Amino acid sequence: MNESENSPQHNEVTVPMVEDTSSNADIPMEQIQREDNKNYDKHDNECFDMNGNHNNNSDNLQFDSVPSSATKDLKNIKSVTNQNVKIEESSSTNSVIEESSEPKISKLENVNLAATVGGSQTRKYLNTNVTPHLLAGMRLIAVQQPEDPLRVLGEYLIEQSNILKSGEKESNASK
């Protein structure tokens, strides 16, 4: 950012305002802007005490008092800053996912989940026959991030099923 963007400009409307323009239909825009600037000037000369109470006596101005126009600008700056932080975090996450597109062998692939976890017969069946393929397919769609992730996951699972069937046929033929 430039320094001119960071420093507040006096007598300029820096905060976009939404207002009812139906009553201002016949008034030129320049006059409306001049009136807005006058309102900001008046407001900047008013004082607030430590509790936020309003008084017009500038002799009672305290060090920590802040005009509300400055507070509005500060809130807008904070919201823009928070949005930028969120964008940066998500963009760095995406770059990490793209860089890790090479398949990595997990230590858990060689673990017999059914024996390790135990549980009901249904849980053992799912852990043996479904979960490893489902997790591998979910890793695939997390890396690729396709437009239709469910279709890609389904096609991957069908492909794995065909590979398992052909592997069983080959093992039966060799016996």
From Swiss-Prot:
Extent of the signal sequence: none
Source superkingdom: Eukaryota
Biological processes per GO annotation: subtelomeric heterochromatin formation
Record's keyword terms, sorted: Nucleus
Region annotation (Disordered) ranges: 1-45
Entry function: Component of the Set1C/COMPASS complex that specifically mono-, di- and trimethylates histone H3 to form H3K4me1/2/3, which subsequently plays a role in telomere length maintenance and transcription elongation regulation. COMPASS recognizes ubiquitinated H2B on one face of the nucleosome which stimulates the methylation of H3 on the opposing face.
Biased composition regions of type Polar residues, renumbered to the chain: 1-12
Name of the featured protein: COMPASS component SDC1
